[in-house]
Regions:
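Sec-dependent signal peptide recognition
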Residues: 1-7
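N-terminal signal peptide c-region/cleavage motif recognized by signal peptidases
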Residues: 12-14
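Periplasmic polypeptide-binding modules associated with outer-membrane biogenesis and secretion
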Residues: 18-29, 36-269, 278, 292-310, ...
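Outer-membrane beta-barrel proteins
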Residues: 69, 329-336, 408-417, 549
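Gram-negative/organellar outer-membrane beta-barrel architecture
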Residues: 110-116, 213-402, 429, 437, ...
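Outer-membrane beta-barrel and related beta-rich outer-membrane complex signature
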Residues: 367-371, 415, 449-460, 522-524
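Transmembrane beta-barrel strand/turn architecture of Gram-negative outer membrane proteins
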Residues: 401-409, 416-449
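Extracytoplasmic gating/loop element in the C-terminal half of outer-membrane beta-barrel translocons
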Residues: 433-511, 517-519
Length: 566
């Protein structure tokens, strides 16, 4: 019976009423900083005791003084809510702020004439500013950070003082920053590499004796990673060998495996399942030659391609590439076997532009609608391209541009005379953390009277995952009298897509596509729909449900794709 009575008593004891806080009288940064202090209290710490109220006043005063308000008035009153607990009402009047009356800012040592330090000095606390302890500390941290990035490794404050006279509402900032001597790059040594040292030295973006700059070590690390030659890269400064403020750089490398095989799978309502195999030999010899072989198989198309890359002395910017590809296509009204052999010369230009000069031989045996023929073409060409992005998977910002031209003429052995132009553009931008816009343009033109003498691979078709959603793969083009696709002289498509982040790397998308492929006059097609995006480490996984508003037959298409969005 005693146990039953004890249990009943336990269940009838009322829960302890809690005390809450309510702040008023402040706005903006003052309110936010005080609220940060208040948010540190656990619910069990808050009480109506005079001891807690005294602590509360102290903390609020500290929060306001950090922003230059030393003469605040804090009024705390108690509001009881019956059995629902009580509330402390905190009314704050910040008062007049304390301002900086005088500053004494000096840069000493080699940095006194450094342009970056002069720019940073312009961001220092100035006379007339409200005292802000956070900005004062941030400015000191910025000086130290800049010094480390630019090689002033002996930098120190010979004087650092923030003097506040609350009674006079005045403050004085005194900072003397002695940078000392700026260090310089010494020799760069590689170890563990399988590539000739002279090739690696061409990647070094600085000369021995040049002023130290941390960003250039980052550039060197990225350039080494971009070669695909190494599985690990460790860049360190040899502090034991410093002489006369010269800093040697040691780079420890580990070779990448000689063979790398990647597989992939995809599906779309256009061509069904797609299988991909990529066999990469990232380095074949000490000169850094590489071989990349790709195999792609779907119901509509099977292809194999091999590319042999020969870096030149400037490894990061110049290389030759010999390429051969074989492709079989059987889809819609196209049946073709094509063989491509190309020799390309690549240059990296300023502002991330690539220039590629090429000469390509194409032999294609084909049936396009009711036309059966074969073609042998020798086409010199040149293209300019640029691709940039910030982040991976689903980059916050990205842009891609491509402009290219190929020319063919019987005077050098081709079966036809024409000029073929191609252009692509894409742009990604983000707004906040949840909104993205993706836009794409794709266009092409063939300068000749008729495309009947051209193989299908050079004619233009529209429709598919990355071109004109809502229409089957390459299903939009001029038709012959039997209603069969024959390809066009021109093509233009545009896409605008909005994405909303649902959670993590998952996004919802809605889009509208517009475009056509034509010879005489365009028959514009519209496609709309929605989709799901997942930002995987290797690129966006995209599933789209699309409707062709001008499609004949079934207007619905399911599109699935994996990889970069542009």
């Amino acid at each position: 019976m005693r146990y039953l009575l004890l249990t009943l008593l336990l269940f009838t004891v009322p829960a302890q009423a809690q005390t809450t806080l309510r702040l008023s009288g402040l706005t903006g940064e003052l309110e936010a900083n005080v609220q940060r202090y208040l948010d540190r209290y656990a619910a069990t710490e808050i009480s109506t005791s005079l001891r807690f109220q005294s602590r509360l006043e102290q903390d609020i005063g500290t929060a306001l003084q950090a922003l230059g308000y030393y003469h605040s008035e804090i009024d705390i009153s108690l509001q009881r809510n019956g059995h629902n607990g009580s509330r402390l009402l905190i009314r704050v009047t910040p008062g007049e702020p304390t301002r900086i009356k005088e500053t004494d800012l000096q840069i000493l040592g080699d940095a006194q004439n450094d342009a970056d330090f002069l720019v940073l000095l312009a961001q220092a606390p100035q006379a007339g500013d409200i005292v802000h302890h956070g900005r004062y500390d941030s400015f000191k941290a910025a000086l130290n950070s800049l010094a480390q990035r630019k090689g002033y490794f002996d930098a120190r404050f010979s004087l650092q003082r923030l003097e506040v006279a609350p009674s006079r509402r005045e403050a004085f900032v005194r900072l003397h920053f002695d940078s000392g001597t700026r260090y310089r790059f010494g020799r760069v040594s590689f170890s563990g590499q399988q590539i000739a040292s002279d090739r690696l030295q061409s990647l070094v973006p600085f000369q021995a004796g040049a002023p130290y700059l941390a960003s250039q070590l980052g550039e060197l690390n990225q350039a080494l990673a971009n070669t695909n030659w190494f599985s690990s890269i460790l860049v360190t400064a040899d502090t034991e060998e410093i002489t006369e403020h010269t800093l040697p750089i040691n780079i420890e490398l580990a070779p990448r495996k000689r063979n790398s095989i990647e597989t992939g799978i995809g599906y779309s309502d256009d061509v069904g399942a797609r299988l991909k195999l990529n066999w990469l030999k990232p380095w074949l010899n000490e000169r850094g030659h590489s071989l990349n072989t790709k195999l792609a198989i779907s119901g509509a198309e099977q292809s194999v391609e091999a590319a042999y890359k020969l870096p030149l002395q400037s490894v990061a910017t110049d290389f030759w590439q010999l390429q051969y590809g074989l492709r079989n296509r059987d889809y819609q009204d196209t049946r073709a076997i094509e063989s491509n052999l190309a020799l390309e010369r690549h240059w990296l230009l300023a502002n991330d532009w690539y220039r590629t000069a090429s000469i390509r031989w194409l032999y294609e045996d084909y049936t396009q609608a009711d036309q059966e023929d074969s073609s042998s073409l020798l086409m010199p060409g040149i293209s300019f391209s640029r691709s940039r992005q910030s982040g991976s998977g689903m980059p916050r910002q990205a842009d891609r541009l491509l402009l290219g031209i190929e020319v063919s003429d019987p005077s050098w052995g081709s079966d036809a005379s024409f000029v073929r132009l191609r252009g692509r553009a894409g742009y990604i931008d983000s707004f906040g953390d949840r909104h993205r816009m993706v836009s794409r343009l794709d266009a092409g033109a063939i300068l000749m009277e008729t495309v009947e003498n051209l193989p299908p691979s050079l004619r233009f078709f529209a429709g598919g995952d990355n071109n004109l959603r809502g229409y089957a793969y390459e299903s939009v083009s001029p038709l012959n009298q039997q209603g069969e696709l024959i390809g066009g002289r021109y093509m233009a498509t545009a896409s605008l897509e909005y994405q909303y982040r649902v959670t993590g790397n998952w996004w919802l998308a809605t889009f509208a596509d517009y475009g056509s492929a034509w010879t005489d006059s365009p028959d514009w097609k519209r496609g709309v729909g929605f989709g799901v995006r997942w930002g995987s480490p290797i690129g966006a996984v995209r599933i789209d449900f699309a409707w062709g508003l001008d499609a004949e037959g079934s207007p619905f298409q399911l599109h699935f794709s994996l990889g970069p969005e542009l």
